[in-house]
Amino acid sequence: MDPESRRLFNVRKVLKGKKPQFKRTCSHKFKKLDDNWRRPRGSQGKQRRKYAAKGALAQVGYGSPAAVKGLHPSGYSDVLISSIAELELVDPSFEAIRIAGKIGAKKKALIIAKAEEAGIKVLNPGRSE
């Protein structure tokens, strides 16, 4: 990883630490309301009008730097694999694989072995048995 990417990963880590947990308005009052973020749209809504004690709004400034957005913390781009044939399409210099959950233990072991031969990083190898 080049020094600029490493710096941007550190910036992303700091920004994620400062980011508040965005919660839906009044989700603490009603059991039927999930905590999942929904933009407040009420005309008199305190959260929409940015009252300090009512929780933060999701805004552009909380985002990660564009160069490292969506990357795995290891610095690799995440690629979902569900067959051995898909391994040939992966570039090991900047991509790492994640084996699909529907894959059984035997096929997963084969994919991991082929990935090691090709020098590809596996993000979810599981327990070795």
Swiss-Prot record:
This is Large ribosomal subunit protein eL32. Keywords: Ribonucleoprotein, Ribosomal protein. The lineage of its organism: Archaea, Methanobacteriati, Methanobacteriota, Stenosarchaea group, Methanomicrobia. One of its GO terms (cellular component) is cytosolic large ribosomal subunit. GO terms for molecular function: structural constituent of ribosome. Belongs to the eukaryotic ribosomal protein eL32 family. GO terms for biological process: translation. InterPro entries: Ribosomal_eL32, Ribosomal_eL32_arc, Ribosomal_eL32_CS, Ribosomal_eL32_sf. It comes from Methanosarcina mazei (strain ATCC BAA-159 / DSM 3647 / Goe1 / Go1 / JCM 11833 / OCM 88). Pfam families: Ribosomal_L32e. HAMAP family: Ribosomal_eL32.
